[in-house]
């Protein structure tokens, strides 16, 4: 090696331990054929600078940039990115598969439910509409007027009233029930109970005969006491009415003859049958 190597030891050949010149020429000649199969180590021709550039270009490089395969972080990042893309791919591909595979099943299972729900929903909506019927002012007035007269209606009366105000008997019945409930709740909230019927009014009658003896004159104190016990205010009687009552009492006592218990004519007369 020392015999053939006549050049200085600072050449690129000595640094890179490249083969001899004959081998280099052979490699240069065979280079185009072998380039297709794989890169060869070095080819040197011409001056030193050109040979160094050729040697650098002829190095087996995987890519002109830094290879990230040696970095563990990049390897982990690449693995996670691949996993993420795979998940996205599955998510993107899953809906059409699920929709294509499962679409007939829910339609078969849910179609009866939908058919059942649609009439049910329509029935509920119809019931709600029936409950929320808006009565006109004339209908409300007639219903309230009849309610004040009679709180409970029989079936014929209900039908007659419904025909008059252009409603159904069921609507009239429900309105009466709701109105009775509202009235009852209003009384309960106000703390008002059903007031009892007022007792019959007591009228003070002047006493003209007491213990079989006529009363010639009525005293004002006795009349006031009688009216107070009867619950009638004393002011209801005026002075003229009092005088009239006294005059009637005197006239009645004067007009009635008082016969003695033992009259001579009555004792002498004898009836024969």
Curated annotation (Swiss-Prot):
Residues 128-187 bind DNA. GO terms for biological process: cell differentiation. It is found in: Nucleus. PROSITE patterns: HOMEOBOX_1, HOMEOBOX_2. This is Homeobox protein Nkx-2.2. One of its GO terms (molecular function) is cis-regulatory region sequence-specific DNA binding. Residues 1-56, 91-131 are annotated as: Disordered. Interacts with OLIG2. It comes from Mesocricetus auratus. Transcriptional activator involved in the development of insulin-producting beta cells in the endocrine pancreas. May also be involved in specifying diencephalic neuromeric boundaries, and in controlling the expression of genes that play a role in axonal guidance. Binds to elements within the NEUROD1 promoter. Belongs to the NK-2 homeobox family. It comes from the Eukaryota. Keywords: Activator, Developmental protein, DNA-binding, Homeobox, Nucleus, Transcription, Transcription regulation.
């Amino acid at each position: 090696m020392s015999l053939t190597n006549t050049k200085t030891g600072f050449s690129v050949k000595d640094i890179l331990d490249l083969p001899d010149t004959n081998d280099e020429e052979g490699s240069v000649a065979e280079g185009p054929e072998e380039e297709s199969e794989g890169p060869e180590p070095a080819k040197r021709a011409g001056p030193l600078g050109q040979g160094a550039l050729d040697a650098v270009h002829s190095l087996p490089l995987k890519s002109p940039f830094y290879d990230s395969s040696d970095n563990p972080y990049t390897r982990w990042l690449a693995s996670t990115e691949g996993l993420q893309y795979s998940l996205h791919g599955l998510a993107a591909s899953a809906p059409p598969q699920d929709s294509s595979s499962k679409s007939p099943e829910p339609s078969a299972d849910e179609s009866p439910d939908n058919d059942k729900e649609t009439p049910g929903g329509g029935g509920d909506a119809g019931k709600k509409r029936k409950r929320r019927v808006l009565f006109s002012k004339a209908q409300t007035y007639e219903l309230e007027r009849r309610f004040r007269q009679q709180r409970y209606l029989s079936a014929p009366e209900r039908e007659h009233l419904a025909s008059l105000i252009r409603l159904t008997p069921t609507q009239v019945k429900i309105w009466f029930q709701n109105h009775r409930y509202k009235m009852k709740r209003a009384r309960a909230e106000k703390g008002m109970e059903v007031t009892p019927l007022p007792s019959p009014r007591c009228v003070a009658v002047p006493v003209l005969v007491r213990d079989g003896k006529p009363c010639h004159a009525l005293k004002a104190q006795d009349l006031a006491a009688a009216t107070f016990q009867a619950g009638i205010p004393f002011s209801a009687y005026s002075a003229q009415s009092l005088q009239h009552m006294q005059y009637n009492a005197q006239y009645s006592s004067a007009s009635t003859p008082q016969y003695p218990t033992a009259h001579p004519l009555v004792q002498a007369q004898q009836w024969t049958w």
